[in-house]
Design a protein with these regions (language model features):
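Subtilisin-like serine protease catalytic core
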Residues: 1-90, 106, 110, 138-142, ...
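Solvent-exposed, polar/charged alpha-helical surfaces in well-ordered, non-transmembrane soluble domains
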Residues: 55-59, 89, 93-96, 100, ...
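Conserved, well-structured beta-alpha core segment at the onset of a catalytic domain
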Residues: 1-4, 107-109, 118-145, 150-195
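C-terminal subdomain of the subtilisin-like protease fold in secreted/lumenal serine endopeptidases
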Residues: 104-121, 125-127, 136-147, 153-156, ...
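Ser/Thr/Pro-rich, low-complexity mucin-like regions
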Residues: 88, 99, 257-281
Length: 478
C-alpha cells in the first residue's frame, strides 16, 4: 500500500527476443530484478497492442490498492507474470518457468489464466495441453481459469445424425471494426469411431445458391486442404484440416476456416454423417491465429438449424484439474439501503463439455469490477480514480468478463494456501466446491453442479475457515 516495494518476483515477455531469456530457454526476455522491471515498464506491444488486461486482472487477484479502496483479494501475494506466444509449447514453457521459479523460492504457485481458445487441441479435457496442466497440478500447482465470455452467443450446434445432413449459416464478425480480422473458424468434433463430412455453400442475398464446395470426409481427407469457391468475379477462400481419430480422444475432427467474403455473400456450413453426434463451434479468427469470441450459426428457413450457447467452455478451462470460473454481478446496497445485484452475467460461457463433463466449477463477481489499469495502455476506458507515483499517473477503471471473476477465485486460492500450505490442488478445489454458497439467484443446485453456476458462488471466508480446520457457525449476508 505504501508503494515502497514491488511484489513482482519476475516477468517473462516471450514476444521480446532481445534477451536475456530465462535459463534453459532460447527465446523471450526475463526481468528478474526490480530495476529490470521498472526499466521495462510494460510488455511488448504484441497482437493486442498495449493492452491492460493483465494489469487489471493482477489488481483483482492481489493488488495493494495503492491507498485506494480497490484492493485485491490476496493483497500481500507475490507475482510471476508471463506474456506468452500463441503456441501450446510456449504455454507449457510458461508453466514450467513459473513452477521452477516458485519452487526455488519455496512458495506455492497459483496460476491464473484469463485466456481461452477453441482451436488449441481438443476441448474435452483430454488434449496434450490439458494433460500437461493436470501433470503440473499433480505436482502442487493450482490452476484457475476464466470460463469464457460466449454466453448468449449462439455459436454452437450439437447434431445427432442418422444418414442425414445439417445446413446452417456461418455468420461473420463485422470486418470494418477490426483491421486484423481474417474470417471464421468452424471447429467440429464427432463421436469416436464415427465419421462426418463438411463443406460450404455460397448464397446471394436472396438465398440463391451461387457456388458450392464438395464434401470433405474426416475418414478420407488428407490432413490439410487449401481451396476456394469461385462466384462470378469473386472468390471465397477456405481451408480445412481433418483427423479420422484425434490422438488424445479418438474423435473425428475438422477445422474449417473461411475467409470473410469481399461481397455480400452468405456462407453456409453443410455437413453430413451416417450416424453419431457432432458438435460445431463458430469462432472469429484474426490474422494472428487468435480469436475466441463466438458468432452465431443461424437459420435461413426450412431445412436449416440455428445455433445455441451451450457447451461454450474452451481451452484451458476444459482441463480436468483447472478451477473454471463463471461470472455474476456482485451484491451491493442501493442508496436506499436495499441489497441488490447477484444475478448471473449474461456473457458468462456455459457448460457442459462435449463429453458431458460439468464445467464451470464455481462462479465469482465479474461485472463492472474496479481494478488497476496499465499506465502504458492505448485502450479506451473511464477512469474511476487515479494515483500519482514517481511522476506517473496510475488509473483504476471498471471492466467486465470472466477475466475478472477468475482472479477473484485465484486470490481466494492464495488465501487458502496461505492458511494451509499442505493442501493439494484437488483438496483446494474440493474446499471451494464444498463451501460454495447458494442464493435466490442460483436456486438450489444439484450435487453434481450446474452448467451456469458450477457449484455455486465463491465463499472466501468459509473456504479459508475450512482450510484452517476451524469449525463453527458462519453467517454470510447474501
Amino acid at each position: 500500500t505504501l508503494l515502497a516495494n514491488t511484489r513482482i518476483i519476475a516477468a517473462w515477455d516471450q514476444f521480446k527476443n532481445s534477451g536475456p531469456a530465462p535459463a534453459g530457454y532460447s527465446y523471450g526476455t526475463e526481468y528478474s530484478t526490480p530495476t529490470d522491471l521498472i526499466n521495462a515498464g510494460a510488455d511488448t506491444a504484441n497482437i493486442y497492442s498495449y493492452a491492460t488486461h493483465g494489469s487489471h486482472v493482477a489488481g483483482i487477484a492481489g493488488g495493494s490498492g495503492a491507498g485506494t479502496e480497490f484492493r485485491g483479494i490476496a493483497f500481500e501475494s507475490e507475482f510471476l507474470i508471463t506474456t506468452f506466444l500463441v503456441d501450446e509449447s510456449a504455454v507449457i514453457d510458461a508453466w514450467e518457468w513459473m513452477k521452477n521459479t516458485a519452487d526455488a523460492q519455496g512458495k506455492r504457485l497459483v496460476v491464473n489464466m484469463i485466456w481461452g481458445l477453441y482451436h488449441m487441441q481438443a476441448i474435452d479435457g483430454n488434449s496434450l495441453l490439458s494433460q500437461a496442466l493436470d501433470n503440473y497440478s499433480s505436482q502442487g500447482v493450482v490452476f484457475v481459469t476464466s470460463a469464457g465470455n460466449n454466453g448468449g452467443e449462439n455459436f454452437h450446434i450439437k447434431q445427432d445424425f442418422a444418414n442425414d445432413s445439417l445446413l446452417t449459416r456461418i455468420n461473420f464478425y463485422n470486418s470494418t471494426t477490426l483491421s486484423t480480422l481474417w474470417g471464421q473458424s468452424v471447429h467440429a468434433w464427432g463421436t469416436p469411431g464415427e465419421e462426418f463430412s463438411v463443406g460450404i455453400k455460397v448464397l446471394n442475398t436472396s438465398n440463391v445458391l451461387v457456388g458450392e464446395s464438395q464434401y470433405y470426409s474426416t475418414a478420407t481427407t488428407v490432413n490439410y486442404i487449401d481451396s476456394f469457391v469461385v462466384v462470378g468475379t469473386d472468390t471465397v477462400f477456405f481451408n480445412l484440416s481433418c483427423d479420422a481419430a484425434y490422438p488424445t480422444n479418438g474423435r473425428p475432427q475438422a477445422r474449417l476456416r473461411v475467409k470473410r467474403p469481399s461481397g455480400s455473400y452468405r456462407v453456409v456450413l453443410k455437413s453430413q454423417a451416417p450416424s453419431g453426434t457432432v458438435h460445431y463451434w463458430n469462432v472469429t479468427e484474426l490474422t494472428s491465429d487468435v480469436g475466441n469470441w463466438g458468432m452465431p450459426f443461424s437459420s435461413l428457413g426450412s431445412g436449416y438449424t440455428a445455433g445455441n450457447d451451450s457447451n461454450g467452455i474452451g481451452t484451458p478451462a476444459c482441463s480436468n484439474s483447472a478451477i473454471s470460473v463463471a461470472a455474476y454481478a456482485a451484491n451491493f446496497y442501493t442508496a436506499g439501503g436495499t441489497l441488490a445485484g447477484g444475478a448471473p452475467a449474461n456473457f458468462s460461457s456455459t457448460g457442459p463439455l462435449m463429453n458431458d463433463t460439468l464445467k464451470p466449477d464455481i462462479s465469482a463477481p465479474g461485472i463492472q469490477v474496479t481494478s488497476s489499469m496499465s499506465s502504458y495502455t492505448d485502450a479506451a476506458y473511464t477512469t474511476i480514480t487515479s494515483v500519482d507515483f514517481n511522476s506517473r499517473t496510475y488509473d483504476f477503471a471498471r471492466l467486465s468478463g470472466t477475466s475478472m471473476s477468475s482472479p477473484v477465485v485465484a486470490g481466494v486460492v492464495a488465501l487458502i494456501l496461505n492458511a494451509n500450505p499442505t493442501l493439494t490442488p484437488a483438496q483446494v478445489k474440493d474446499i471451494i466446491i464444498q463451501t460454495a454458497r447458494e442464493d435466490s439467484h442460483t436456486g438450489v443446485l444439484p450435487p453434481e453442479g450446474d452448467v451456469n453456476w458450477g457449484h455455486g458462488k465463491i465463499n472466501a471466508y468459509l473456504a479459508v475457515q475450512t482450510a484452517l480446520g476451524v469449525v463453527g457457525t458462519v453467517e454470510i449476508e447474501q
